[in-house]
A protein has these predicted regions:
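Glycine-rich phosphate/adenosyl-contacting loop at the front of the ribokinase-like
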Residues: 1-60, 67-69
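Conserved beta-alpha-beta core of the PfkB/ribokinase-like small-molecule kinase fold
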Residues: 131-173
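Short gly/ser/thr-rich secondary-structure transition/capping motifs
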Residues: 78, 111-119, 157-164
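Active-site-proximal loop->helix
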Residues: 65-77, 96-98, 102, 122
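Conserved phosphate-binding/catalytic loop of the ribokinase/pfkB sugar-kinase fold
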Residues: 86, 96-131, 136
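A glycine-rich helix N-cap at a beta->alpha junction
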Residues: 73-88
Length: 173
């Protein structure tokens, strides 16, 4: 079985249902609030874990209750956790409004995800790894360093270019 390494975001999604998405300056009433383990990186790892893949997740969370819940979720879904904790920022969150047509509007607050810096990437993370999976909810310079290190080892790399942003062409080669 191939070994997969996901390096990316872990967020606590705070989801509410609304009749319609508010316009500028408008306040709308939400229907309930649901806390759901999320983050593009964690979602990728969990999906592969549910399928029985040998997957490891690396990212950063705070030292708060959301961090504990997110790490418990990874474990329950069969994902090996090598997530780092920091007291310098809270765990990342996403504020999500879902309207009656099931269209959503999302605001992501990076929190600890934004503290995963290029100089923190360890060559040992890539030992015995067959596939690296990334997305863009961690700093772009960190993504570039991860791609560089994976490429140097000829590791197949998957980049989910979301949230959308301009990417240097060299990053995609």
């Amino acid at each position: 079985m191939k070994k997969i390494l996901v390096i990316g975001s872990l967020n606590m999604d705070q989801v509410t249902k609304v009749h319609h998405t508010p316009k500028v300056g408008e306040t709308v009433v939400g229907n309930g609030l649901e806390l759901i383990a999320g983050g593009k990186g964690a979602n990728q790892a969990v999906a592969m874990g549910k399928l029985g893949a040998d997957v490891t997740m690396i990212g950063m969370v705070g030292t708060d209750d959301f961090a504990s819940q997110l790490l418990d979720n990874l474990k329950q879904m069969g994902v090996t956790d090598k997530v780092m904790k920091t007291d310098k920022a809270p765990t990342g969150t996403a504020l999500i409004m879902v309207n009656e047509s099931a269209d959503n509007s999302i605001v992501v607050i990076a929190g600890a995800n934004g503290l995963l810096k290029p100089d923190m990437i360890k060559p040992s993370w890539f030992d015995d790894i067959d596939i690296v999976v990334l997305q863009l909810e961690i700093p772009l310079d960190t993504v570039a360093e991860i791609i560089k290190q994976a490429k140097a080892r000829n590791i197949y790399t998957v980049l989910n270019p979301s949230p959308a942003t301009h990417l240097d062409e060299d990053l995609l080669k």
